[in-house]
Amino acid sequence: MVGACYMQAFLEQGHSLVGLCELQPNAAVADAVQAAGAQVHAAPGAWLAEADVVVSAVFGTVARSLFEACLPHLRDGVVYVDMTTADPQEMRECGELARRVAQGRAVHFVDVAITGAVNLGGSKTPLLVAGGKAGFVQELFLPLGGSVRVVGGQPGDAAALKLLRSIYTKGAEALAVECLVTAQQMGLREQLHAVLQDIDETPLRTLMESMVRTHIPHSARRRNEVAEARQQMARNGLAPIALTAVEALFADTARAHAVQPFTGTSTDEAIDWLGSHVLASRP
């Protein structure tokens, strides 16, 4: 879906299509490729040498292997745009691979992270871009109408930021599922939105930093509140999953604070203490 979306958007901007690599294209995509005067290919090959820009939009688990398969066929000066949700370290390794294995050719690997739902935003979905040719890629995508932000000079920087964002957004999504389902069960869904209004009115950065800054000294009391919220879910025939993990984090913080009291007052001090005493990996 992502590849077809951006293919169509680039065609509408007047770019030429060299070809599409797709094992099982649907009829609409195949027709669009044919209408653009190109062909659908089952694998990377010599046809890639005609491209100035190659866009990869596959699953993150195969991002590196696909790049390795494309690399021998890429022309000097090509920009390879990886739009997969791949591991940041793999993106860095691909960037290094492009520098080492290009055999005298300049191959520019650029990491592009999609930070929204393409099925909703289409080619206007916000993007994060990182790599030596990030500025070029930004200029390439900006005419499509979305936000395109350069976030780093090394491949992997965009992917890393997207995954950091996912800690918050996917965690919030999981809690939203449990919260709204419980509210619906209790007949309080509309009233819930009203009592959450103060959160709507608080800038996200202010909210996050306040939560972290006050988390440690209030962890024991807040853990009890989370336990009561879990019991309320259970009384309504629901089995908490995300909220159980939330309670465990508050309990771990409370235990650590009892052993090694936190005496700081700033967000930075709280982050350092939590990283050392609560979230650090244990052998």
Feature map (PLM): residue ranges:
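Helical "substrate-binding/catalytic lid" subdomain
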Residues: L161-G264
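NAD(P)-dependent dehydrogenase/reductase Rossmann-like domain
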Residues: A251-P283
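NAD(P)+-binding Rossmann beta1-loop-alpha1 motif at the extreme N-terminus of oxidoreductases
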Residues: M1-A49
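Hydrophobic beta-strand scaffold residues
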Residues: L17, V40, H108-V110, V148, ...
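Short, well-ordered alpha-helix to beta-strand connector turns
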Residues: G14, G37, E50-A51, G77, ...
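Glycine- and other small-residue-rich loops at beta-strand/loop junctions that grip anionic moieties
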Residues: E22, S56-F59, M83-T84, G152-G153, ...
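Rossmann-fold NAD(P) dinucleotide-binding segment
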Residues: P44-V112
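Rossmann-fold dinucleotide-binding core
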Residues: A63, A86-K170
